Amino acid sequence: MILLGIDFDGTSHEVGRGIPPIGQHSWGRYSARAGVPRHLDMLDRMQVPATFFVPGYDGEQHPDLVAEIATRGHEVAAHGYLHEAWDLQPEEEETLLRKTDQILRQVTGQPVMGWRSPSGRKSNRTLGVLKSMGYIYDSSDKDYDMPYRLRYGKGDGDSIIELPNNTYSLDDFPFFKFSFTPPSLVLEQWKQEFDVIYKNEGFFVLSVHPRSGWGSGTPSRTRLMADIITYIKGHDGVQFMRAKDYAQWCVNHSNRLEEVTIL
């Protein structure tokens, strides 16, 4: 199973830290102006679906573009409001989760089904709020190779599908933030990761950010995405799915999944 996760991460990344998105801090503006449109066109050419994790603030700033993501057949999922570090008080956390949900629903005209933490963090309250809004999955944890049922409370309905994104090397950030690795070398790394996962009939989750700077929005790095998709499509039996579709399959076949309890 192949999930392509594209973290929109526009100017929310800077604005949330009190940094004006200008000059050397304007990388997030590239996401909306060039990176996301380029990725959408690439995905059309490759004929594969993806899940775009969108901060609520970016949905407010670029409603037409976020709506276009949905109309072109991709999923729009939640990714915080201002790409918060998620060290929030209970009321603030719930307010931001519900605010982002409302923004994305209004922009796309579709329900939001999943969430990925903008910082990799969550609290012991997060999943309960998500479930109360009708979400069926989270994609933040790093603790397993396959999807599972994550039980966060003692009630009958206190569980959610976890789609872990646990492989740091299947993310553009470490390659382009710290070393500006050539895309050709990143492609080889991603191929090696895929080969092992494919051999073991596993779960391949790729995470990219269509920004400039440390992201994958520029032409050579978007081509990297196309190259790994082409490589994957050359293997028998692979299937690309939106996260919400795979999560719904997991819900429908939950008896096949391991359950993990975190209280």
Language-model features: locations:
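Positively charged, amphipathic and often flexible ligand-engagement surfaces
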Residues: 163-180, 201
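Catalytic alpha-helical scaffold of carbohydrate-active enzymes acting on polysaccharides/glycoconjugates
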Residues: 1-114, 119-163, 186-206, 214-263
